[in-house]
């Protein structure tokens, strides 16, 4: 790659994916005036298979595989991901090199009739495709009915507006980025529902030997966000977490101290194992591993073993 070669960003075509790609393009050009950046749009399996729960068709990796192949084949230089959708491991030659500043990590309660979860009537129908959200919702409100909800943000809102659901749960960050914050009736605090690993953060994946690009991306990395998200991801990697299992995790920085909370649960909310750990931010990844092992020893191992057996 020469100094004048345009940077090519591989991106899905959904409005949120395009927002993220343009966000990185703008940030690169702000940091390096005159730099040429192009978007290379593509369709992934996750965009096409909309009639089956993610957990049953390969999980979140469905949204990134085509982008990774494009980078490995030299058709694109980097890919921009919502961190909550990034699998725990990467193909050889690629890596997560930059994590941008985190947006709101909370879940959002969206409804045309009700203001919050407490207002939902007995047996209300709530839409989500996330086992993590389902698990925590069902623990709090065992009476509600969870109904599968797939598609991009606009599609999901359309299904709510068509009367298929009493409420739906979406990531607050996505709604804010798409200027749809007015659809949020209330925010669900982490104390009530822990977010997904990396929720609200945008990450950049590229070839790890592309020295010119690594240098260009340096100003986009947000250290506080990266420390928090890498702590959460270390926990998730140790649990071998994926789409098939309800795992929530959220790290906060308080000065140089990092505070990590996490949970593993049954999809129906009948059992949830929770834990937390605090320590110095420089030990964030070790703390993530420590908490994962504590969760495993406290009952999470049995939950995970059962869930993975059910999917085999």
Curated annotation (Swiss-Prot):
SUPFAM superfamilies: Periplasmic binding protein-like II, Porphobilinogen deaminase (hydroxymethylbilane synthase), C-terminal domain. The keyword Lyase does not apply. Signal peptide: none annotated. Coiled coil: none annotated. Its EC number is 2.5.1.61. Pathway: Porphyrin-containing compound metabolism; protoporphyrin-IX biosynthesis; coproporphyrinogen-III from 5-aminolevulinate: step 2/4. The porphobilinogen subunits are added to the dipyrromethane group. Monomer. HAMAP family: Porphobil_deam (MF_00260). This is Porphobilinogen deaminase. The lineage of its organism: Bacteria, Pseudomonadati, Pseudomonadota, Gammaproteobacteria, Vibrionales. The gene is hemC.
């Amino acid at each position: 790659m020469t100094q004048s070669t345009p940077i090519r960003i591989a991106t899905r075509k959904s409005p949120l994916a395009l927002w993220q790609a343009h966000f990185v393009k703008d940030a690169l050009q702000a940091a390096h005036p005159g730099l040429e950046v192009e978007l290379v749009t593509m369709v992934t399996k996750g965009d096409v298979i909309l009639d089956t729960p993610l957990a049953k068709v390969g999980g979140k990796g469905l949204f990134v595989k085509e982008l990774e192949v494009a980078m490995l084949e030299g058709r694109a230089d980097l890919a921009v991901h919502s961190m909550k959708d990034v699998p725990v491991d990467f193909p050889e030659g690629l890596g997560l090199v930059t994590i941008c500043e985190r947006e709101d990590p909370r879940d959002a309660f969206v409804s045309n009739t009700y203001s919050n979860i407490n207002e939902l009537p007995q047996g209300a129908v709530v839409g989500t495709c996330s086992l993590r959200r389902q698990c925590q919702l069902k623990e709090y409100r065992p009476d509600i009915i969870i109904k599968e909800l797939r598609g991009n943000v606009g599609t999901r809102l359309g299904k709510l507006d068509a009367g298929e659901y009493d409420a739906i749960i979406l990531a607050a960050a996505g709604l804010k980025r798409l200027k749809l914050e007015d659809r949020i009736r209330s925010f669900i605090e982490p104390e009530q529902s822990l977010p997904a690993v990396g929720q609200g953060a945008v990450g950049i994946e590229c070839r790890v030997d592309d020295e010119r690009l690594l240098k260009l991306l340096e100003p986009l990395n947000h250290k506080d966000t990266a420390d928090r998200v890498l702590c959460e991801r270390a926990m998730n990697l140790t649990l071998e977490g994926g789409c098939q299992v309800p795992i929530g995790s959220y790290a906060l920085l308080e000065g140089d101290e990092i505070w990590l909370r996490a949970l593993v649960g049954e999809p129906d909310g009948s059992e949830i194992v929770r834990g937390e750990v605090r320590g110095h931010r420089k030990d964030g990844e070790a703390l993530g591993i420590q908490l994962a092992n504590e969760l495993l020893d406290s009952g999470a191992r049995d939950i995970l073993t059962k869930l993975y057996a059910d999917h085999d």
